[in-house]
Amino acid sequence: MDLSGECLDVSFEIDEEEESDSVAIPLFRNVLYQKTAYYSELIEKELPGVPVLAFHSYKGGVGRTLSLLAFVKAWSELNNLGNGQKLLIIDADIEAPGITWLTMKQEEAAFSFLDLLEITQEKDSTDEIIELIADKVLELNVKIETERGRAEHIVLPTYRYVEQLLDMYASPESLAISYNKKYILAEVLSKLGEKINAGLVLVDLRAGLSEFSAPLLFDPRVKKYLVTSTSYQSVKGTGILLQQLSKGLPLNENSKIPEVLLTMVQNGMNTAEIISELIAAYYPNAIEGDDSIMDDIVTELPFS
């Protein structure tokens, strides 16, 4: 409609409570187009509860879950089996659960990772979430065999029943795109671990460039272990992961720099070229710092 000589007043209202645009969305599809993979205010900060360690791999079948369980056994033996602090072990491999099967000999689990995601999607307060779920998680005790005997830890399975797995209400990805919840998952896991008196939280993530894994991978407060075999495709894929995970990350002792576990190393195999290639993947996008930090960034694990 043409009204000659008339003008329309336009006013803008700014909500001071709105989430800042500088808060990066921790998903691969977003990080790809950013200079940094991380929300700068979180770099070099700690989680509010106990440390969270995430085990990830580009490919399946390279020993990621076995590496996590080896960590559990080593922790148990160093901490006097039943007398030490328990670990909270979470099966976050939503598309191919593995650790969940440790709980399948028992009755239906009282609680699951998918339950945790649903409650976190619905509630805004991390303290309220923890109060709702802590008692149920404490019921999830599982005995794990070690060389020195049985150790008891808390294992949070992916799901309670198959239908829950096939028809998900919430996922790590849906949390990452929710208002003010981009980095809530790591905070909930950390505070949950503290509430149930766990020493650490260990998370077995979905393999690949999966948005189900991205929210924890791109939270700079989470310690990451990337597991790769010596195969060509596994090493190349791990290099892609490292390039994305190192974007904007200072290479210094205050950063939780992703570490690599090189598995299935045959006796007598020369891995120097593989290790050099993996270390080189950190540098194009990272903020360079102390190069000595990178000396032990790759750990070789023999084939057994």
Locate the predicted segments by residue.
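Phosphate/oxyanion-binding active-site loops and adjacent basic polyanion-contact surfaces
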Residues: 24, 29-32, 63-67, 177-185, ...
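Conserved catalytic-core segment of NTP-binding enzymes
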Residues: 85-86, 182-291
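Walker A/P-loop phosphate-binding motif and the immediately C-terminal alpha-helix
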Residues: 38-97, 101
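Short secondary-structure boundary/capping segments
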Residues: 70-72, 102-113, 117, 171-173, ...
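C-terminal lobe/tail of nucleotide-utilizing enzymes
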Residues: 1-44, 247-304
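P-loop/Walker-type NTP enzyme "switch/lid" segment
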Residues: 94-194
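Short loop/turn segments at strand-loop or loop-helix junctions that form parts
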Residues: 155-161, 229, 301-304
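Conserved beta-strand scaffold positions in the cores of enzyme catalytic domains, especially
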Residues: 50-52, 89, 153-155, 224, ...
